[in-house]
Amino acid sequence: MAHKKAGGSSRNGRDSAGRRLGVKRFGGEQVLSGNIIIRQRGTKYHPGANVGLGKDHTIFATADGTVKFHTGLKGRTFVSIVPGADEAVPAVAAE
């Protein structure tokens, strides 16, 4: 009597899609209020001035300005927004 053994089943072959975490706006970049600066799990980066922290630890701008990364107490990295004179379109000299 001919028999064929049943094939084994693989336990691998699954993976989840990446979560698209990380820094979205780097130091020195201009941002508008509401722009997302960092998506993270936990507080690897902490909120500084003119920055908010979402319930999923997303850091976002609360004011227009320039992104600045700096180190604070206990070696924590903070992200702040430095409001500055926005680079407006230069006026054309009158002839």
Curated annotation (Swiss-Prot):
* GO molecular function (one): structural constituent of ribosome
> A Pfam family matched by this chain, by name?
Ribosomal_L27
Q: What's a single GO BP term from this record? A: translation
The UniProt annotation puts the region (Disordered) at 1-22
Q: From the record, what ranges are coiled-coil?
A: none
Q: Which family does it belong to?
A: Belongs to the bacterial ribosomal protein bL27 family.
How is this protein annotated for GO cellular component? cytosolic large ribosomal subunit
- Protease as UniProt keyword: no
Query: What keyword terms does UniProt attach to this protein?
Result: Ribonucleoprotein, Ribosomal protein
Q: What is this protein called?
A: Large ribosomal subunit protein bL27
The gene that this protein is the product of is rpmA
Leader peptide range in chain numbering? none
